[in-house]
Swiss-Prot record:
GO terms for cellular component: plasma membrane. This is Uncharacterized membrane protein PM0507. Keywords: Cell membrane, Membrane, Transmembrane, Transmembrane helix. Its main location: membrane. The keyword Iron does not apply. It is a multi-pass membrane protein.
Amino acid sequence: MKAIKDSAIYLFGELISRSVPFLLLPYLSRKLGVEGFGELSYYQTYLALFLIIVGLSQEGAIARFFYVYGKRALNLVVNAGYAYTLSIGSVILAFCLFFKAEMLAYLALSAIFQSFLAVQLSVRQCQKQAVAYSVIQFLSASLSAGITVFMLEMYQTELVEKRILAILFSNLLVFLFAYLLYRQKTRIKSFNFRQYKTALYYLLGFGLPLIFHNVSLFLRGQLDRIFIYHAFSEAELGLYAMGAQIAAIVMILIQVLNKALVPYFFEGLKQQRITLVQVQRWARYSLLLVPIPALIMWFIPEPFVVWLLGSQFVGTKYYIVLFLIATTLVVPYLILVNYLFYHGQNKSISICSVLTTLIYVISLLGLTLTEIQFVPLASIIGAVSILPVLYWMTAKVGK
């Protein structure tokens, strides 16, 4: 019963906290305008890239360490990870300052504190502190929104920079709050240099192999913004990025449902109540769901979208429709990939990830040479192309 209650708290907290940035979209679209929103989405790609480098999947390493080795030396791994993040983050920061890239320096600092915060959230999740986990998440999202509104109302220029600073300040403040609570509840032990070195090797051993996978996810999720920024105007990127942002609301719902259903899915596979035939049938039937969100969006009048986002965002509806198709294609993907995860086919999943990325990047390169209206098709091509491969792999595993 406690497991169900905790799961409900986690899911509710995640849904609420991840909804806050989307509730902020109409405000940001009006304050930044279409060009400013395009510029912001471009800089956010660097934040995602820096986070991969300084984070090194530490939250996953912390979770594995806790469940495999226990909590006695957990603080050792946490501190070793923080030392790594500070070291690598300082190198990135030094490059930014050397090249006088002030905005990138803010993003590097934000990535450092966001990585710190992700580790704190992982510790709470491992220790089954569902309420604390949800409170920290909600505090991070709401504080970021609050500081953003405050700064954009206080200043009239360099508004993209102010939004980035708001993200930085919220990451810093929430991390300090979470870390102070962590220190109060953690028995501090002294460790020697050799133990810290061992902990660092553990983190590197866990995180480095995942770099390629994370970079693949980055390329599929962020590379298009960089290409569009250099090939088209900031205004066109703004429309494109807004369409992707709104379609991502459906992705949140899919991820929340996936997180809630995976334990029952795995349990059904373990007890053989769920078979490969059923899994593949569900994947096929889920394809019928793919056009539904896009069709609903298609019937929503364009003037309503413009009223919601602002007069500069005429044409955003087109991008929302296309990105909704690409997003909903995640449903059959998750059904098939969860089956492979259960059977420990991580290598097969990695191969699929690399293959999808290659197809996506090639499609993106080709479509970027045409018109921006065709660029979202790269996401659909990448999402569709991987499904037959996953279907074949699940059939191979189920034999």
